[in-house]
A protein has these predicted regions:
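Primarily a LysM-type cell-wall glycan-binding module
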Residues: 21-49
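Extracellular LysM carbohydrate-binding repeats and other cell-envelope/extracellular binding modules
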Residues: 22-27, 50-87
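Flexible, surface-exposed loop/linker segments and immediately adjacent secondary-structure boundaries
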Residues: 37, 71-265, 270-273
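Conserved aromatic anchor
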Residues: 273-285
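Short beta-strand segments within Ig-like beta-sandwich modules, predominantly Fibronectin type-III
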Residues: 302-308
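Surface-exposed, short loops/turns at beta-strand junctions within beta-sandwich domains
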Residues: 314-322
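Extracellular fibronectin type III
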Residues: 331-336
Length: 336
Protein backbone atom coordinates (compact mmCIF):
# COMPACT_ATOMS: atom_id res chain seq x y z
CA UNK A 1 0.00 0.00 0.00
CA UNK A 2 1.13 3.57 -0.68
CA UNK A 3 2.55 4.87 2.61
CA UNK A 4 1.16 8.34 1.94
CA UNK A 5 -2.36 7.20 2.80
CA UNK A 6 -3.52 9.09 5.91
CA UNK A 7 -5.95 7.48 8.30
CA UNK A 8 -9.09 9.46 7.70
CA UNK A 9 -11.27 6.55 8.79
CA UNK A 10 -11.18 4.07 11.65
CA UNK A 11 -10.79 0.34 11.10
CA UNK A 12 -14.16 -1.33 10.93
CA UNK A 13 -13.74 -3.31 14.13
CA UNK A 14 -16.12 -0.65 15.45
CA UNK A 15 -18.64 -1.21 12.65
CA UNK A 16 -20.77 -3.68 14.60
CA UNK A 17 -21.16 -1.36 17.57
CA UNK A 18 -21.81 1.65 15.37
CA UNK A 19 -24.44 -0.07 13.22
CA UNK A 20 -26.26 -1.66 16.13
CA UNK A 21 -26.67 1.66 17.86
CA UNK A 22 -29.20 2.66 15.20
CA UNK A 23 -32.70 1.35 14.64
CA UNK A 24 -32.14 -1.33 12.03
CA UNK A 25 -35.23 -0.18 10.13
CA UNK A 26 -33.56 3.19 9.59
CA UNK A 27 -31.04 3.95 6.84
CA UNK A 28 -27.56 2.57 7.56
CA UNK A 29 -25.35 5.66 7.80
CA UNK A 30 -22.05 4.11 6.72
CA UNK A 31 -20.64 1.88 3.98
CA UNK A 32 -17.74 -0.48 4.64
CA UNK A 33 -14.76 -0.30 2.24
CA UNK A 34 -11.72 -2.62 2.41
CA UNK A 35 -8.40 -0.91 1.71
CA UNK A 36 -6.44 -2.32 -1.25
CA UNK A 37 -2.79 -2.07 -2.24
CA UNK A 38 -2.11 1.31 -3.84
CA UNK A 39 -5.07 3.08 -2.26
CA UNK A 40 -4.58 6.64 -1.13
CA UNK A 41 -7.17 8.93 0.31
CA UNK A 42 -6.97 11.25 -2.68
CA UNK A 43 -7.63 8.32 -5.05
CA UNK A 44 -10.54 7.08 -2.97
CA UNK A 45 -12.04 10.54 -2.75
CA UNK A 46 -11.76 11.14 -6.49
CA UNK A 47 -13.24 7.76 -7.42
CA UNK A 48 -15.99 7.29 -4.85
CA UNK A 49 -16.81 10.50 -3.00
CA UNK A 50 -18.83 13.56 -3.83
CA UNK A 51 -16.79 16.72 -4.23
CA UNK A 52 -15.83 18.72 -2.29
CA UNK A 53 -15.18 16.01 0.28
CA UNK A 54 -17.07 16.44 3.56
CA UNK A 55 -14.12 15.98 5.91
CA UNK A 56 -16.20 16.79 8.98
CA UNK A 57 -18.57 13.90 8.20
CA UNK A 58 -15.64 11.51 7.75
CA UNK A 59 -14.07 12.54 11.03
CA UNK A 60 -17.38 12.30 12.90
CA UNK A 61 -18.19 8.83 11.54
CA UNK A 62 -14.76 7.50 12.46
CA UNK A 63 -14.10 9.38 15.72
CA UNK A 64 -10.75 10.64 14.41
CA UNK A 65 -8.25 12.44 16.56
CA UNK A 66 -4.98 11.96 14.69
CA UNK A 67 -3.83 11.23 11.14
CA UNK A 68 -2.13 7.85 10.95
CA UNK A 69 -1.28 5.13 8.43
CA UNK A 70 -3.89 2.59 7.35
CA UNK A 71 -2.91 -1.04 6.55
CA UNK A 72 -4.05 -2.98 3.50
CA UNK A 73 -7.12 -5.07 4.32
CA UNK A 74 -8.51 -2.68 6.91
CA UNK A 75 -12.20 -1.89 6.52
CA UNK A 76 -13.19 1.76 6.46
CA UNK A 77 -16.47 3.37 7.46
CA UNK A 78 -17.55 5.88 4.82
CA UNK A 79 -20.62 8.03 5.53
CA UNK A 80 -23.26 7.04 2.98
CA UNK A 81 -24.40 10.55 2.15
CA UNK A 82 -20.98 11.62 0.79
CA UNK A 83 -20.61 8.71 -1.67
CA UNK A 84 -21.22 9.38 -5.38
CA UNK A 85 -24.66 8.28 -6.61
CA UNK A 86 -26.26 7.52 -9.97
CA UNK A 87 -29.77 6.63 -11.12
CA UNK A 88 -30.97 3.03 -11.06
CA UNK A 89 -34.13 1.65 -12.66
CA UNK A 90 -36.71 -1.12 -12.60
CA UNK A 91 -38.49 -2.76 -15.52
CA UNK A 92 -41.96 -4.23 -15.93
CA UNK A 93 -41.52 -8.01 -15.67
CA UNK A 94 -45.16 -9.09 -15.96
CA UNK A 95 -48.44 -7.30 -16.55
CA UNK A 96 -52.05 -8.41 -16.56
CA UNK A 97 -54.77 -5.82 -17.15
CA UNK A 98 -57.69 -5.36 -19.54
CA UNK A 99 -57.19 -1.58 -19.51
CA UNK A 100 -53.99 0.45 -20.13
CA UNK A 101 -51.98 1.43 -17.04
CA UNK A 102 -50.13 4.74 -17.23
CA UNK A 103 -47.79 6.55 -14.89
CA UNK A 104 -47.56 10.33 -14.70
CA UNK A 105 -45.86 12.09 -17.65
CA UNK A 106 -45.56 8.81 -19.60
CA UNK A 107 -46.52 9.02 -23.27
CA UNK A 108 -47.23 5.28 -23.51
CA UNK A 109 -49.02 2.80 -21.22
CA UNK A 110 -47.01 0.26 -19.28
CA UNK A 111 -45.86 -2.83 -21.18
CA UNK A 112 -43.44 -5.70 -20.58
CA UNK A 113 -39.96 -4.16 -20.48
CA UNK A 114 -41.07 -0.59 -19.71
CA UNK A 115 -38.38 1.16 -17.65
CA UNK A 116 -39.50 2.59 -14.29
CA UNK A 117 -37.39 5.21 -12.52
CA UNK A 118 -37.21 6.94 -9.16
CA UNK A 119 -40.27 9.04 -8.41
CA UNK A 120 -42.73 6.93 -10.43
CA UNK A 121 -46.17 6.28 -8.94
CA UNK A 122 -47.87 3.08 -10.08
CA UNK A 123 -51.61 2.69 -9.48
CA UNK A 124 -52.93 -0.75 -10.34
CA UNK A 125 -56.59 -0.91 -11.43
CA UNK A 126 -58.94 -3.53 -9.95
CA UNK A 127 -58.47 -7.05 -11.35
CA UNK A 128 -54.98 -6.14 -12.62
CA UNK A 129 -51.49 -7.19 -11.55
CA UNK A 130 -48.03 -5.72 -12.20
CA UNK A 131 -44.54 -7.06 -11.36
CA UNK A 132 -41.30 -5.05 -11.45
CA UNK A 133 -37.73 -6.34 -11.66
CA UNK A 134 -34.92 -4.32 -10.05
CA UNK A 135 -31.34 -4.27 -11.33
CA UNK A 136 -30.15 -6.61 -8.57
CA UNK A 137 -32.83 -9.21 -9.32
CA UNK A 138 -35.26 -8.20 -6.56
CA UNK A 139 -38.94 -8.45 -7.54
CA UNK A 140 -41.83 -6.16 -6.58
CA UNK A 141 -45.35 -7.55 -7.17
CA UNK A 142 -48.37 -5.26 -7.10
CA UNK A 143 -51.75 -6.99 -6.95
CA UNK A 144 -55.18 -5.55 -7.72
CA UNK A 145 -55.88 -1.97 -6.55
CA UNK A 146 -52.39 -1.33 -5.13
CA UNK A 147 -50.77 2.11 -5.27
CA UNK A 148 -46.99 2.41 -4.85
CA UNK A 149 -44.46 5.23 -5.17
CA UNK A 150 -40.83 4.46 -6.05
CA UNK A 151 -39.48 7.09 -3.66
CA UNK A 152 -35.79 6.18 -3.95
CA UNK A 153 -34.12 4.04 -6.61
CA UNK A 154 -30.42 4.80 -7.03
CA UNK A 155 -26.97 3.24 -6.90
CA UNK A 156 -23.81 4.49 -5.24
CA UNK A 157 -20.20 4.07 -6.32
CA UNK A 158 -19.38 1.49 -3.63
CA UNK A 159 -22.32 -0.95 -3.72
CA UNK A 160 -23.67 -3.02 -6.60
CA UNK A 161 -27.27 -3.21 -5.37
CA UNK A 162 -29.49 -0.11 -5.57
CA UNK A 163 -30.83 1.78 -2.59
CA UNK A 164 -34.60 1.31 -2.55
CA UNK A 165 -37.37 3.12 -0.69
CA UNK A 166 -40.99 2.41 -1.48
CA UNK A 167 -44.16 4.10 -0.22
CA UNK A 168 -47.31 1.96 -0.29
CA UNK A 169 -50.33 4.26 -0.15
CA UNK A 170 -53.03 1.69 -0.90
CA UNK A 171 -53.51 -2.06 -1.09
CA UNK A 172 -50.78 -4.66 -0.85
CA UNK A 173 -47.29 -5.31 -2.20
CA UNK A 174 -45.31 -8.56 -2.33
CA UNK A 175 -41.51 -8.38 -2.33
CA UNK A 176 -38.83 -10.94 -3.08
CA UNK A 177 -35.61 -9.15 -2.13
CA UNK A 178 -32.38 -10.51 -3.62
CA UNK A 179 -30.45 -12.36 -0.93
CA UNK A 180 -27.08 -11.22 -2.28
CA UNK A 181 -27.64 -7.59 -1.27
CA UNK A 182 -25.18 -6.14 1.24
CA UNK A 183 -26.69 -5.87 4.72
CA UNK A 184 -25.96 -2.15 4.81
CA UNK A 185 -27.66 -1.30 1.48
CA UNK A 186 -31.05 0.25 2.34
CA UNK A 187 -34.21 -1.48 1.17
CA UNK A 188 -37.15 0.07 2.95
CA UNK A 189 -40.90 0.12 2.49
CA UNK A 190 -43.24 2.50 4.27
CA UNK A 191 -46.99 2.85 4.68
CA UNK A 192 -48.75 5.65 6.56
CA UNK A 193 -48.76 3.29 9.56
CA UNK A 194 -45.51 1.31 9.40
CA UNK A 195 -41.85 1.16 8.37
CA UNK A 196 -40.03 -2.00 7.28
CA UNK A 197 -36.28 -2.45 6.78
CA UNK A 198 -35.24 -5.50 4.78
CA UNK A 199 -32.13 -7.68 4.73
CA UNK A 200 -32.78 -10.15 1.91
CA UNK A 201 -36.16 -11.81 2.28
CA UNK A 202 -39.62 -12.49 0.86
CA UNK A 203 -42.52 -10.72 2.48
CA UNK A 204 -45.80 -8.87 1.96
CA UNK A 205 -47.09 -5.51 3.18
CA UNK A 206 -50.68 -4.30 3.27
CA UNK A 207 -52.36 -0.97 4.02
CA UNK A 208 -56.00 0.12 3.90
CA UNK A 209 -57.02 3.73 4.51
CA UNK A 210 -60.66 2.58 4.80
CA UNK A 211 -59.89 0.10 7.59
CA UNK A 212 -57.07 2.30 8.96
CA UNK A 213 -54.93 -0.78 9.42
CA UNK A 214 -51.80 -2.42 8.03
CA UNK A 215 -50.13 -5.82 7.91
CA UNK A 216 -46.63 -7.27 7.50
CA UNK A 217 -46.28 -10.96 6.60
CA UNK A 218 -42.87 -12.65 6.30
CA UNK A 219 -42.45 -15.69 4.04
CA UNK A 220 -38.66 -15.93 4.32
CA UNK A 221 -35.77 -14.17 6.04
CA UNK A 222 -36.14 -11.34 8.54
CA UNK A 223 -37.97 -8.01 8.30
CA UNK A 224 -37.27 -5.30 10.87
CA UNK A 225 -40.73 -3.78 11.46
CA UNK A 226 -42.07 -0.91 13.48
CA UNK A 227 -45.27 1.08 13.49
CA UNK A 228 -44.96 4.71 12.50
CA UNK A 229 -45.34 5.76 16.16
CA UNK A 230 -43.20 2.97 17.65
CA UNK A 231 -39.74 3.86 18.91
CA UNK A 232 -38.10 0.51 18.20
CA UNK A 233 -38.27 -2.06 15.40
CA UNK A 234 -38.96 -5.74 16.01
CA UNK A 235 -37.55 -8.58 13.88
CA UNK A 236 -40.32 -10.56 12.15
CA UNK A 237 -39.13 -13.94 10.89
CA UNK A 238 -40.38 -16.57 8.45
CA UNK A 239 -43.95 -17.71 9.02
CA UNK A 240 -44.84 -14.78 11.27
CA UNK A 241 -46.74 -11.55 10.76
CA UNK A 242 -47.72 -8.44 12.66
CA UNK A 243 -50.82 -6.22 12.31
CA UNK A 244 -50.45 -2.43 12.59
CA UNK A 245 -53.29 -0.47 14.18
CA UNK A 246 -54.66 2.92 13.16
CA UNK A 247 -52.42 4.71 15.67
CA UNK A 248 -49.31 3.36 13.97
CA UNK A 249 -48.60 0.78 16.68
CA UNK A 250 -47.35 -2.70 15.85
CA UNK A 251 -49.52 -5.22 17.69
CA UNK A 252 -48.70 -8.74 18.87
CA UNK A 253 -46.75 -10.97 16.47
CA UNK A 254 -48.88 -13.80 15.07
CA UNK A 255 -48.21 -17.13 13.39
CA UNK A 256 -49.40 -16.99 9.78
CA UNK A 257 -52.30 -19.36 9.16
CA UNK A 258 -51.88 -22.40 6.88
CA UNK A 259 -53.89 -22.57 3.65
CA UNK A 260 -57.07 -24.66 3.51
CA UNK A 261 -56.52 -28.11 2.01
CA UNK A 262 -58.59 -29.63 -0.79
CA UNK A 263 -61.06 -32.13 0.69
CA UNK A 264 -63.48 -33.17 -2.05
CA UNK A 265 -65.34 -31.96 -5.14
CA UNK A 266 -69.01 -32.30 -5.98
CA UNK A 267 -70.22 -31.95 -9.57
CA UNK A 268 -73.32 -29.92 -10.34
CA UNK A 269 -76.03 -31.19 -12.67
CA UNK A 270 -75.85 -30.56 -16.43
CA UNK A 271 -74.12 -31.71 -19.61
CA UNK A 272 -71.09 -29.56 -18.77
CA UNK A 273 -71.07 -29.66 -14.98
CA UNK A 274 -69.33 -27.22 -12.70
CA UNK A 275 -67.81 -28.26 -9.40
CA UNK A 276 -67.99 -27.18 -5.78
CA UNK A 277 -64.69 -27.95 -4.06
CA UNK A 278 -64.90 -28.57 -0.33
CA UNK A 279 -61.92 -27.22 1.62
CA UNK A 280 -60.70 -28.19 5.07
CA UNK A 281 -61.63 -25.26 7.34
CA UNK A 282 -58.90 -23.45 9.28
CA UNK A 283 -60.17 -22.78 12.84
CA UNK A 284 -58.77 -19.24 13.22
CA UNK A 285 -59.47 -18.09 9.65
CA UNK A 286 -61.82 -15.13 9.25
CA UNK A 287 -62.10 -15.79 5.50
CA UNK A 288 -60.10 -17.23 2.61
CA UNK A 289 -58.59 -15.75 -0.56
CA UNK A 290 -58.41 -17.66 -3.84
CA UNK A 291 -56.17 -16.54 -6.72
CA UNK A 292 -56.41 -18.27 -10.08
CA UNK A 293 -54.51 -18.06 -13.37
CA UNK A 294 -53.61 -20.13 -16.40
CA UNK A 295 -49.95 -20.35 -15.34
CA UNK A 296 -48.46 -22.19 -12.36
CA UNK A 297 -46.67 -19.07 -11.06
CA UNK A 298 -49.92 -17.03 -11.32
CA UNK A 299 -48.53 -14.57 -13.87
CA UNK A 300 -50.54 -13.42 -16.87
CA UNK A 301 -54.31 -13.10 -16.52
CA UNK A 302 -55.11 -13.56 -12.85
CA UNK A 303 -58.27 -13.22 -10.80
CA UNK A 304 -58.73 -12.99 -7.04
CA UNK A 305 -61.75 -13.19 -4.77
CA UNK A 306 -62.66 -13.88 -1.15
CA UNK A 307 -64.40 -16.94 0.27
CA UNK A 308 -66.44 -16.53 3.44
CA UNK A 309 -66.86 -20.31 3.72
CA UNK A 310 -64.39 -23.11 2.90
CA UNK A 311 -65.99 -23.84 -0.47
CA UNK A 312 -64.67 -23.02 -3.93
CA UNK A 313 -66.90 -22.89 -7.01
CA UNK A 314 -65.09 -24.11 -10.13
CA UNK A 315 -66.76 -23.32 -13.49
CA UNK A 316 -67.04 -25.97 -16.15
CA UNK A 317 -63.78 -27.74 -16.91
CA UNK A 318 -62.07 -26.94 -20.24
CA UNK A 319 -58.88 -28.03 -21.98
CA UNK A 320 -57.16 -24.91 -20.60
CA UNK A 321 -55.50 -25.63 -17.25
CA UNK A 322 -56.34 -23.35 -14.33
CA UNK A 323 -54.12 -23.05 -11.26
CA UNK A 324 -55.45 -22.00 -7.86
CA UNK A 325 -53.68 -20.55 -4.83
CA UNK A 326 -55.57 -20.62 -1.53
CA UNK A 327 -54.71 -18.58 1.55
CA UNK A 328 -56.30 -18.07 4.96
CA UNK A 329 -56.82 -14.62 6.49
CA UNK A 330 -56.86 -14.08 10.26
CA UNK A 331 -59.20 -11.79 12.18
CA UNK A 332 -56.43 -9.17 12.28
CA UNK A 333 -56.15 -9.21 8.47
CA UNK A 334 -52.90 -11.20 8.19
CA UNK A 335 -52.77 -13.33 5.04
CA UNK A 336 -51.22 -16.77 5.52
Amino acid sequence: MNKSLPLLFIAAMSLGVFAQSKDSADEPSVISYKIKTGDTFSKLAQKYLQQPVDMAAIQKANQLKNIDMLPVGAELLIPRHIVKQSASHASIMSLSCATPIRIADASKPLAIGTVIREGAIIEVPPECHVSLLLEDGSVIRLPSSAALKITTLRKNALESAPEVRLDLTRGRVELDVHKGRAKTTPFEIRTPLSIMGVRGTEFRVGYSSEDNAGQVEVLGGIVQTRGSTDTKARPITKGLGVPIDGDGKALAIEQLLPPPAFESAIATAGSQPSFVAKLTPIPLANYYVVDSANTANLTGNRSSHNLLAPELFIPRVTKQATFYQLTSVSASGLVG
